[in-house]
């Protein structure tokens, strides 16, 4: 599981940061990539990465401001032009379906794959299967803006092979049955419960990805205990009144939430073009005074999210 940031800027693109988009890469877990937001130029950013558009199976839209959606129709059309045939599902607020369908209709773009929309209204579960669960709630922005909580379900424990051998259970298909937790009967009449030969389940990982928001109580349960929290940082530490006025957050407000929620690592994005390198360093430094495991991300940066049993300090490794 990895997050790759495709756009980390706020409002408008700059020379160093494109507008909002990130990819949650689940290639080992599902052979898929999930896209969160698709600001203008997202497909250009994807070209600079190893991400294959046909691998993108889901797109989650936090809200309908242009810097989060203007790149979506172009990406969808290019995915089709590049031979994509696998279905794609878009999750987002009411209005996203009209926006996409109107854009495709006016431009006479025809997709080569099925496109499904899941319109998110009442807080709850956006998606769930045997391996992942995605929940959402409304945050506090000028328009409807969502935060998403992506939870990987626990992985079954490993077969305790030494214990199996100590019981003198012959190798073969019976091992698979034991690992599946089944009760097996051997030719010699001995009966074994597979659960007795399975180690503890491995906890899954949790990532919280927020759209634009100012501080609100609904953010806490979405972020609680997450391995990684991705949170906007449009304003600096001394601009809380501006943040409130414009429905955004400061870096130190995000850090306070991360501390309160007990997350593993805080990743700050949605960085204003007003902050050049010295300013970005200041955002990171002042946030770390509240929550030490904070990092201000940049475009194309990749964040690996290991299982908790594999983690050492820091909890998440950063590659650029």
Swiss-Prot record:
What is the cofactor note? Binds 2 Zn(2+) ions.
Q: Which UniProt keywords apply?
A: Endonuclease, Hydrolase, Metal-binding, Nuclease, tRNA processing, Zinc
Q: Which cofactor does it need?
A: Zn(2+)
The positions flagged as active site in the entry are 67 (proton acceptor)
The name of this protein is Ribonuclease Z
How does the record describe its quaternary structure? Homodimer.
Q: Which family does it belong to?
A: Belongs to the RNase Z family.
The reactions it catalyses are: Endonucleolytic cleavage of RNA, removing extra 3' nucleotides from tRNA precursor, generating 3' termini of tRNAs. A 3'-hydroxy group is left at the tRNA terminus and a 5'-phosphoryl group is left at the trailer molecule
Q: Where along the chain is Zn(2+) 2 bound? A: 67-68, 212, 270
Q: What is its EC number?
A: 3.1.26.11
- What does this chain do? Zinc phosphodiesterase, which displays some tRNA 3'-processing endonuclease activity. Probably involved in tRNA maturation, by removing a 3'-trailer from precursor tRNA.
Which organism does this record belong to?
A: Lacticaseibacillus paracasei (strain ATCC 334 / BCRC 17002 / CCUG 31169 / CIP 107868 / KCTC 3260 / NRRL B-441) (Lactobacillus paracasei)
Q: Where does Zn(2+) 1 bind?
A: 63, 65, 141, 212
Root EC class: hydrolase
Q: Which GO terms describe its molecular function?
A: 3'-tRNA processing endoribonuclease activity; zinc ion binding
- The source's domain of life comes to Bacteria
Please spell out the taxonomic lineage of the organism that makes this protein.
Answer: Bacteria, Bacillati, Bacillota, Bacilli, Lactobacillales
CDD domains per UniProt: RNaseZ_ZiPD-like_MBL-fold
Gene name in the database record: rnz
Q: Which InterPro entries match?
A: Metallo-B-lactamas (IPR001279), RibonucZ/Hydroxyglut_hydro (IPR036866), RNase_Z/BN (IPR013471)
């Amino acid at each position: 599981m990895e997050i790759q940031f495709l756009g980390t800027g706020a409002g408008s693109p700059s020379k160093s940061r494109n507008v909002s988009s990130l990819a949650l890469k689940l290639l080992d877990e599902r052979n898929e990539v999930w896209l969160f937001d698709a600001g203008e130029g997202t497909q250009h950013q994807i070209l600079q990465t190893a991400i294959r558009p046909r691998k993108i199976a889901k797109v989650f839209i936090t809200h309908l401001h242009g810097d989060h959606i203007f790149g979506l129709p172009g990406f969808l059309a290019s995915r089709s032009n590049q031979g994509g045939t696998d279905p794609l599902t878009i999750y987002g607020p009411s209005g996203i379906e009209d926006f996409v369908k109107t854009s495709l209709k006016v431009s006479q773009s025809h997709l080569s794959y099925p496109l499904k929309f899941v319109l998110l209204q009442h807080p709850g579960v956006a998606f769930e299967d045997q391996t992942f669960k995605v929940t959402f709630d409304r945050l506090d922005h000028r328009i409807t803006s969502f935060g998403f909580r992506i939870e990987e379900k626990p992985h079954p424990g490993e077969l305790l092979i030494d214990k199996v051998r100590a019981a003198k259970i012959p190798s073969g298909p019976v091992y698979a049955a034991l690992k599946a937790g089944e009760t097996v009967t051997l030719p010699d009449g001995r009966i074994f419960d597979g659960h007795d030969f399975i180690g503890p389940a491995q906890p899954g990982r949790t990532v919280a990805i927020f759209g634009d928001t100012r501080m609100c109580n609904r953010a806490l349960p979405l972020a609680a205990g997450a391995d990684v929290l991705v949170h906007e940082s449009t304003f600096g530490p001394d601009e809380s009144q501006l943040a409130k006025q414009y429905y955004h957050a400061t870096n130190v407000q995000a850090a306070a939430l991360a501390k309160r929620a007990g997350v593993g690592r805080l990743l700050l994005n949605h960085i204003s073009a007003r902050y050049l390198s010295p300013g970005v360093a200041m955002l990171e430094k002042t946030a770390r005074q509240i929550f030490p495991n904070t990092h201000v991300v940049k475009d194309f940066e990749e964040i690996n999210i290991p299982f908790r049993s594999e983690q050492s300090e820091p909890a998440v490794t950063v590659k650029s």
